[in-house]
Amino acid sequence: IGQPGLPPQGFAQPPLQPFPGNEPYVVVDVNAEETQTGRLMIGAGVNSNAGLVGNIVIDEQNFDITRLPTSWDDIRNGTAFRGAGQRFRLEAAPGTELQRYTATFQEPYLFDTRIGLSTSASYFTRYFFDWAEGRVGGRVGLGYQFVFAPDLSVNTGFRGESVDIFNPRVQGIPDIQGNGTNNPGMLGKNSVYGFSGGIIHDTRDSPFLPTQGHLATFEFEQVIGTFIYPRGVFEARQYFLLNQRPDGSGRHVLSLGTILGFSGPDTPAYDNFYAGGY
């Protein structure tokens, strides 16, 4: 799928070349060349919010979980674990105040249907000013794209996490250490089980580097476990194509976006919304 006059996304050159003729059927010569689908990114940074942080990312957008390597040549020429249109992302971000490790797998067409599957597992540690936080858990989700409205989809998901709050800077704070049965506090290990559902309207020309269209999402989640509370997030983004070369390259894009979230009064501090930083 691409813009008029441009190669379809995922191909270096237009793959279809029809031969002229007067027959009711057109003979098509298919000559497709796949572009680069995998990325390896390595970086590091330092800032006043998170200290020194490294970043290593392996991202493959044409993954195949069933295509195991049969020889060293499959690994050397890049054919192992590729070819099914799945996405796999492995990220490691070690640091002095923040460290995060995640693995994500996405199947956009589960069993050749319009149902998509996404799974992820993560480990996270962050040293805040007033306490330290550690998380380990995973998520699984299903999505469905409507036939009558391809831009519209719905999703449902579940997340399970164990959140450990430790090393409080000040003792006796009720929100951290609690002050009775009605407020157990969040110090120690907390169980988080979230059940969510959402709706998405997406007209972007590309999910990775969009230049036109919009994305509007709304997700509601009910969390149970150590604390019980609802959460909701609305996000909207609009992309405007300002200028481009005659061949479609060198695009200048203006992007506008906003996020609105709400959460119940019993939400613990580790799941609150905060302005600025992370």
Language-model regions, residue ranges each:
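Short loop/turn motifs that connect adjacent beta-strands in outer-membrane beta-barrel proteins
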Residues: D64-G85, Y109-G116, V147-S153, D205-G213, ...
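Conserved short loop/turn motifs at secondary-structure junctions
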Residues: I1, L90-A92, Y123, F220-V223
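C-terminal outer-membrane beta-barrel translocator/porin domains of Gram-negative envelope proteins
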Residues: F19-V27, G38-G51, V57-D59, D164, ...
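Residues that cap or initiate secondary-structure elements
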Residues: Q36, S48-A50, D64, T96-L98, ...
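Periplasmic polypeptide-binding modules associated with outer-membrane biogenesis and secretion
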Residues: I1-N47, E60, L68-E107, E133-V136, ...
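Aromatic side chains
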Residues: F63, F105, S122, F129-W131, ...
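Transmembrane beta-barrel wall of Gram-negative outer-membrane proteins
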Residues: P94-S191
